[in-house]
């Protein structure tokens, strides 16, 4: 204390020394309390406001020294010993586990659904977690207040309560990557150490945190950029705009909680009206007076709830803000200076905390519902009394307990045994967990009170699967179902109200496809007996062949040969050709074929097996093909060419074609020139034959060069020739007197460099036989299917086709093609090599059509299938007809029991149920049984007086003083659940029984944090908007079944009807008065709708100008408050004025609907102020004013719609902005900061402000401060039409070059 005292005295002395201050500051009060982080902040802020920066810095230094000195003396350190675990933790955990055990028991008895159990578990753990946290704090507070961990967290130096909780309490529940909460909590803390399971679960949460941070930084940066762009041109340009407008400040509330107090909102503002004390009527403060901390406190203490202050939202300064409307600059707690770039400051203040907002809130399955309902626990033991007029309806809580829900506000009373009496107020919708006259213990939960209006939480439909924990038969008990068929014909079954699905235990065998049961319901089977069997049947029949190497993974193969063909005279040999193996086929007639399909592959109908090797139809070069008597048809694939139907002669006129595709300059010969063989026609290309050259070129690119062999005859006049070019000339036919060919030639006229000539081109003839030779073959065929090889001749070219080639060309191919006499075209033949029966060294080619059947491997008892055993019924070489059985697979029972559940009719999943002795339970009785045979009993129900059932089940028989139960499990399904099974179905363990449909609270607002801020500032339509009241009045609410019928009736009797979308919850009640713009259903409001509703409502009474102002004012207030709510909920404090500046930029424009007599265009976006001035002018001249609607622009839209096209273009959509500006001939007046930075001028803010402000004469400033203008440096400004050329370089400064070197 002495140290602190000395310190304060020092401050006073320093203050006294500061003689510059007009009045000596009051002595420093002695602050006698613990100083933590918050008090420290206040202390420094107070000193800063009172004594300025220098002394505050000195004081902060002194505080630092003080802190370190005592920390060192006290030896504050941290060791693992300081992590003291509260002793009551074990007992709290045990208590929670007992509660959960009870809930699980209720679940197994079928009293609550899976969802209710899950909800109960999660809520229990959350409560336990909180209790442990409280215990931890109180443990520290009482037993170890100087614990270093506790001091650190408590003072706010480092860490917070939730982190300390993880160190010494329990870590709590974690969410998995889908955002579902895992119902296994982490019960340990870091001091005790986590188990392996807990460690893995906890790493989920950690990963989520990291990913989130990474995404957040990017989003937050982009938000800041957009904010800077929208508000960069807001600069303080005037001292006082003189407006009498203002906004009403009131404390920002969220339900019953004060989020921002009025006092906090008032500090640093300027009053727009005098403030009068409500009781004494004395004036506390005048208009235009600044509100400091003391005045704010005085105003709040006088009980004033609303204060009219000036605000950037209502400032009338042109394109800027005046000092009075902005208020204090938060940097130094004095009125803001002229030329301050408040827009940029606002943008940074809103953008910077972005990284601290959590991004995605995970749908945590209704964990945060604790915040919505306030729990009432009994302060003492006693009896609960309800009033007579209490209206309630029965209600099932989210934990599956029965409770009562209040239909109207009321009270309940708790009476203690010693005459104590406590009255609890209950609001409508509250839940009572006890009945009238019930005895309650101390701290027992009596009721949960809903907080009115706060229930802005919306709910969403979610589904949860119910899974069978045992195999058996489904039995519905008291479960009415409703079937719906949709347009696609899918049927869904839903439960009409809640009921039970029982699964009666038994062994369920899944039958493989095609298996038929061989037992009947009620048969008794022993282990190993056959329950069902399946047969393996051949489709086509044939001869059985059992390959040796046929044991594959899945079982043994059996092959059945349907048909076969052998080339019994041809032998197969293998040759190595270019490093690859080739199979060659030598026939008896001396032909050699090469196999196109290698042995071991399959070929289908009409596919090529082999091709004849021959050189008779090979040409030297390319050429022209002509058919003489040959007939072809296209069969099979196009690339295989044309099949010859009738033989004849192929005529072949050779020519050599070189594809060049090079520049024409490389050509060495001329078109029509005759060249010798071996001439270099183009660089690096030589011709092989002598002949006439034809050059084909296009766009100076040499495409092709053709050399046509033949004899060239120059003629004087080609007109003498009677035979047309392109004709075939027979030997001895006279052309001209001197030319008589001695062989078949093809006539062509050419233009040579020497003149016209005739080219006689030789023609070669190739004879094609009608039928090719086929090697002999013998076919064996079962089941009447024939298979053979057919020889086919194919020509690859059509008649008259020009074949471009330099090398040889094959004109005819002879191929062997497989032909299956087809009634099953999908069959394929296998190609095999077999040894000759007489000479094993000779191999023959065989083609077989096979059917391969797979025998199952014997399965040793798998859980669901039972054990299978397969028997083969045929042997090698057997001949089998169509549909013959080859093997049988038997499914054997694993345990003895009684067969049940065989259903007639075609079921998709074939299953058989065997009820074994394991599924039965015998309970000895002492007295008369109180149940009858067939009854379904739950665990804990009495079978006889004093004998509870050990398990749930169905009573099978009662005899000889004992009851036989068939084990079963009940599952409770809620109304509306989608059923996945029908009554009597057989299910395996792990099958889905039903999907429970339930509503869960969306955590807080659907989107929180950054995305919500972005949604507000971009003025996006929220996903699930609420319905807003369009006119004030009283709600009239009636229900048609589930559908609400909602009307609002005004004072004059006008009725407005509202339609409520499904999934929206009403937050108004019958008879409630509502104002215009109030929400009627839950969900976030759409700001565009708000604006439209307010504008339309006020327009009828006030006219456009006032209506637009009021509507915009409401939306501005809504946006400012919503943004504040998000930031405050995350613990971030931002001054209202920053948000107001941004919101002002968003709400400054209107859209012209009808231009009247003005020069505006319909649809144009104009500043509200501009259009009001224009309309005022019209009113004077008597023209028709423009009609308009106010619009709300998101920050991106607003940035792109600024006056300055340079600023807009540098933000986004550069091309569009610049082209539009160019078309409209816009000029940029360089008013904002960004434009000037881009062009490289001095920015008109800070010291540069006065440089530009000289143009407009300012009214004399009323402040006593000296003006900031430096008079001796007047800027030289030339105003030239619409250009603004400015060189504000004073004369006596260094020239540019020197200046840049500095």
UniProtKB/Swiss-Prot annotation:
Domain of life, per lineage = Bacteria
The record ties this protein, via InterPro entries, to:
DNA-dir_RpoC2_beta_pp, DNA-dir_RpoC_beta_prime, RNA_pol_Rpb1_3, RNA_pol_Rpb1_3_sf, RNA_pol_Rpb1_4, RNA_pol_Rpb1_5, Rpb1_funnel_sf
Q: Where is this region: Disordered?
A: 1-29, 1253-1302
What is this protein called in UniProt?
A: DNA-directed RNA polymerase subunit beta'
Which Pfam families does the record cross-reference, listed alphabetically? RNA_pol_Rpb1_3, RNA_pol_Rpb1_4, RNA_pol_Rpb1_5
Q: Where is the composition biased (Low complexity)?
A: 1268-1277
The major lineage groups are: Bacteria, Bacillati, Cyanobacteriota, Cyanophyceae, Synechococcales
- The entry's Zn(2+)-binding residues are 241, 315, 322, 325
Listed under catalytic activity are: RNA(n) + a ribonucleoside 5'-triphosphate = RNA(n+1) + diphosphate
Spell out the family assignment given in the record's similarity comment. Answer: Belongs to the RNA polymerase beta' chain family. RpoC2 subfamily.
* Quaternary structure and partners: In cyanobacteria the RNAP catalytic core is composed of 2 alpha, 1 beta, 1 beta', 1 gamma and 1 omega subunit. When a sigma factor is associated with the core the holoenzyme is formed, which can initiate transcription.
* Skewed-composition ranges (Acidic residues): 1255-1267, 1280-1302
Q: Which PANTHER family match?
A: DNA-DIRECTED RNA POLYMERASE (PTHR19376), DNA-DIRECTED RNA POLYMERASE SUBUNIT BETA (PTHR19376:SF68)
Q: Which cofactor does it need?
A: Zn(2+)
* Entry keywords, A to Z: DNA-directed RNA polymerase, Metal-binding, Nucleotidyltransferase, Transcription, Transferase, Zinc
| Cofactor note (record) | Binds 1 Zn(2+) ion per subunit.
Which Gene Ontology molecular function entries are recorded, alphabetically?
A: DNA binding; DNA-directed RNA polymerase activity; zinc ion binding
> What NCBIfam families is this protein classified in?
PRK02597.1, rpoC2_cyan
One GO term (biological process)? DNA-templated transcription
Q: Write out the function statement from the record.
A: DNA-dependent RNA polymerase catalyzes the transcription of DNA into RNA using the four ribonucleoside triphosphates as substrates.
GO CC entries:
DNA-directed RNA polymerase complex
Q: What is its EC number?
A: 2.7.7.6
